[in-house]
């Protein structure tokens, strides 16, 4: 299995990316292709690691402040070269660089799976249960039609079933209330269309995401990104409060020591690094979009995520799902569009 890793554009430079690759290679067998500035990377690559990876040199990359459309023009940028390697035989790509550039190039260079109108970013959210919830779209499409959300539901269902091995995953539609009549026009129209699918649970509220009420939560990219960023902010704030309170007194320190295991589980569930990255579903190869501030652990987990996606053949599963849509469901979608 060949995995392409974009070295450039992450907030903390190439070091965490290289360390993440090194750790993953200690635990998994795969071929790693590193794309980026060789001069910046070489000081951090040991002789042992150098013998395990292939290095593609380029100094160009799409900076965070640049427009995503720059990516298609810059054919020597790390993400463009990486995407070409993926298109021409590699199995997956991981990038912690410019997410808009990654999404745009993946769609243009790899192509959309037949039947998918818009690819979506799929992210894992912590829950009180033993397994996380899947949320999509987490930011790829800020303005959506009901048909897009139907696609997201199908892709999220297949991802939960194939990659996460959830048995008969349930899909919920994010709304401001559980009742069928709740939601804006987008939610109401999508709800009508999703009723045709056996996996549809109904509307869910924001709090349900973390209760594990459903396995997959569907929403437009604007709402999904707000949910994601809010969750990250709340988790970070709670962590800071805990740290300050623990340091405030001897009793607090002793109590924290007794609860060390519980705190460890809480940290693991709420730490973005443990989830790796966010798969871009709906394109013809596996692409993982990692957080710009990814540390070595996040990159390591993103690689494991990519390996799972490839081994489960999730792109093929999504393709088959769209090819085998029930005619009555397709007719239902057409009726909704005509109405």
UniProtKB/Swiss-Prot annotation:
An example Gene Ontology CC term for this record: cytoplasm
Enzyme class: transferase
Gene3D superfamilies associated with the record: Isopropylmalate Dehydrogenase
Organism for this UniProt entry: Helicobacter pylori (strain G27)
Pathway assigned to this chain's UniProt record: Lipid metabolism; phospholipid metabolism
NCBIfam families: plsX
Catalytic activity: a fatty acyl-[ACP] + phosphate = an acyl phosphate + holo-[ACP]
Annotated keywords: Cytoplasm, Lipid biosynthesis, Lipid metabolism, Phospholipid biosynthesis, Phospholipid metabolism, Transferase
Record-given protein name: Phosphate acyltransferase
Signal peptide: none
Residue spans crossing the bilayer: none
E.C. number: 2.3.1.274
Family: Belongs to the PlsX family.
Gene Ontology MF annotations: phosphate:acyl-[acyl carrier protein] acyltransferase activity
Entry-linked PANTHER family: FATTY ACID/PHOSPHOLIPID SYNTHESIS PROTEIN PLSX, PHOSPHATE ACYLTRANSFERASE
């Amino acid at each position: 299995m060949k995995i392409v890793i974009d070295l450039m554009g992450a907030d903390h430079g190439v070091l965490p990316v290289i360390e993440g690759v090194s750790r993953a290679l200690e635990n998994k067998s795969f071929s790693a292709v590193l794309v980026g500035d060789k001069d910046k990377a070489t000081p951090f690559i040991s002789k042992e690691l150098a013998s395990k990876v292939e290095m593609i040199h380029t100094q160009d990359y799409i900076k965070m402040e640049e427009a995503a459309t720059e990516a298609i023009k810059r054919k020597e940028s790390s993400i463009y070269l990486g995407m070409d390697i993926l298109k021409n035989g590699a199995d997956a790509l991981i990038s912690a660089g410019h997410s808009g550039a990654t999404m745009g190039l993946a769609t243009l260079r790899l192509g959309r799976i037949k039947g998918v109108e818009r690819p979506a970013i799929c992210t894992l959210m912590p829950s009180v249960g033993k397994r996380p919830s899947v949320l999509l779209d987490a930011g790829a499409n800020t303005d959506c039609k009901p048909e897009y959300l139907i696609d997201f539901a199908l892709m999220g269902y297949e991802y939960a079933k194939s990659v996460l091995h959830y048995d008969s995953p349930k899909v919920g539609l994010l709304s401001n209330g559980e009742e069928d009549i709740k939601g804006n026009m987008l939610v109401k129209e999508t709800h009508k269309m999703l009723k045709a699918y056996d996996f549809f649970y109904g509307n869910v509220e924001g709090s349900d995401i973390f209760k594990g009420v459903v396995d997959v939560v569907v929403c437009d990219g604007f709402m999904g990104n707000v949910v994601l960023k809010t969750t990250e902010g709340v988790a970070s704030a709670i962590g800071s409060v805990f740290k300050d309170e623990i340091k405030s007194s001897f009793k607090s320190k002793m109590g924290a020591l007794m609860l060390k295991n519980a705190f460890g589980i809480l940290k693991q569930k709420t730490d973005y690094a443990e989830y790796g990255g966010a798969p871009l579903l709906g394109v013809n190869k596996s692409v993982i979009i990692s957080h710009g501030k990814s540390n070595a652990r996040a990159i390591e987990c993103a690689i494991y995520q990519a390996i799972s996606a490839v081994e489960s053949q999730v792109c093929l599963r999504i393709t088959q799902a769209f090819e085998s849509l029930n005619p009555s469901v397709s007719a239902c979608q057409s009726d909704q569009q005509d109405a």
